[in-house]
Amino acid sequence: MISVHEAKFEDMALAADIMVTSFRTAFADFVSPETMNACSNPVNCRAMLESIYQERNMYFLMGSNHGFICWQATETGAEIVAIHSLPESWGTGLGHAMLSEALKQIGDCPAYLWAFKENTRARRFYEKHGFHWDGTERVSEFDGALEVRYANEHC
């Protein structure tokens, strides 16, 4: 059974492990080995997530100890900053449960997120959940990869 609950500070160690595993699997085809090594260091990921967790207007949910999602309240809505799950949970409904609960908590306001342009699996997932590419692109700080912005204006 899938459960989604508010994350605690102590969950950031597990979230970092999930992020590293997810990152290494999902982004292997379009991130350089150097960037992969730099961005998938468990100690650095944990420190980053612990820092983000303590920021104002940041919200975290854990999904069945196999995934997490975090978002930030903005002046115009909410930015979903990260959604990661262990590869063995892909396609099980975990991502759907986490994103649905996050959107429920975000409420009646626009939400957006950034996805690697080459990450077709993630883009299909977001489209399935009511997000659409709004035409905005940017160069990511991750290896200069192109990112596209997805919006869900009818939360």
Model-predicted segments: where are they?
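Extreme N-terminal starter segment of soluble prokaryotic enzymes
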Residues: 1-4
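Acetyl-CoA-dependent GNAT
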Residues: 6-12, 16-90, 96-105, 139, ...
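A general structural motif
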Residues: 108-110
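C-terminal "cap" of GNAT-fold acetyltransferases
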Residues: 112-123, 128-129, 134-155
